[in-house]
């Protein structure tokens, strides 16, 4: 069916069909880059990076506007990673979203401290 209308479902771009049908490997590609960024920054942030900072790292890696990455793209990519058994998780602390890349549970005290820290 895709060949009849000239669409390659495995094309590595964020196009109309990939967005509409959830096909293509754009989000898996972003997922791999998310893993790379989280691994590179883990020694600085302990495995907890703000979604905004993560997206900024990805935008620096992907120079062209056509390949710009939004926070929604990151969230979708992380949800695709979960399907593969990944331990990456998006958590909300205060009003900010963070990506946790370590399998550690945060207790109430950790959450409270992080919430206070996000205010500054």
Swiss-Prot record:
Gene coding for it: VP22-2
Protein family membership: Belongs to the SNF8 family.
Organism ancestry: Eukaryota, Viridiplantae, Streptophyta, Embryophyta, Tracheophyta
Name of protein: Putative vacuolar protein sorting-associated protein 22 homolog 2
Coiled coil: none
InterPro entries to which the protein is assigned, alphabetical: ESCRT-2_cplx_Snf8, Snf8/Vps36, WH-like_DNA-bd_sf, WH_DNA-bd_sf
Biological process according to GO: protein transport to vacuole involved in ubiquitin-dependent protein catabolic process via the multivesicular body sorting pathway
Cellular component per GO, a single term: ESCRT II complex
Highest taxon of source: Eukaryota
